[in-house]
Amino acid sequence: MPSLPESYFTRANELLARAWATNAPVLARLAPILGECVARGGVIHTFGSGHSELVSREIIGRAGGLVCVTGIIDPTAGFIENLPGYGTRLAARYDRQHQLLPGEVLIAISNSGKNCSPIEVALHARQKGLTVVALTSLAMSQATPSEHPSGKKLSDVADHVLDNGSVPGDAIVEVFPADLSAKASATAEASAKAGPTSTLIGCSVLNWLMLGTLDWLKQNKHPLPILRSQNLPGAIEHNRDLAQKYKGRLSRQLA
C-alpha cells in the first residue's frame, strides 16, 4: 500500500494533468485578452478571499511574473466574506485608490465559488467594464448553495471560467477509516481525508495563464515586463524601473 505522500503525489498529478487538458482551450482564449491589456499599459487585478488569497498572491510582485499584476487585498482575511455588501465596498475602495479601468482584467478566485465577497468584487469589476475571469472548482461550486443573496455562484457572473478540478471538500487522500460504531454519526463519511489540491492546481493554472500572456506578447513583438528575483544583482533597480509606468496602480509596492 502506498504511503500517504505517495498517494497524494499520484492523485494530485492526475488532477493537475486533467486541469491542463480542461483549461487549455480557455487559456488560449484568454492569452490575447490579457496580452492586449498589458500591451496597452493596463493592469491585471486579482482577488481571492480567505485561503484563495494565497493563490491570488502567487502572481503579484512575483519573480518571473508580470509587473502589472496587482491585488485587491481583504484586510479581514476573509473573516466577513459572507457579509452582503462587504465585497462591493472592498472593490469600490480599491477602485478609488488604484482604479479599475475598462478593458482591464480581474481574476477572481474562490474554490467554492459560493461566497459573497468574490461574487461582489466580480460584479463591481464587470460594471466598470473589466473582463472577469473566475478561477474556481466547478465540482465544489455545484455541490454547495450560494451564500450570495442573488443565489449566483462566481462562475455565473464571470466572462471566462477556469476550473481547478478540485473535488468537493478539496482533500484527496484517505487517512483512516471513520468510526463506524454505534457512537458514530449516521451522517459520518466513510473516511477522513487530507491533502487539498486547490492551491497546488490553482497556482499552476495562474502560472499557465501568465505564460500564455507572455507568449502572446512575444509573438506580437511587445515588450515583456517581467520581474526579476530581488535577490539577484541589479534586480531591484530593474523592477523599480518597470513599475514606474504603473505608479499609483499597484497595491503592492516593489522593493
Q: Predicted regions: what is each one?
A:
Residues L16-V26, L106-N115:
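Short, glycine-rich nucleotide/cofactor-binding loops
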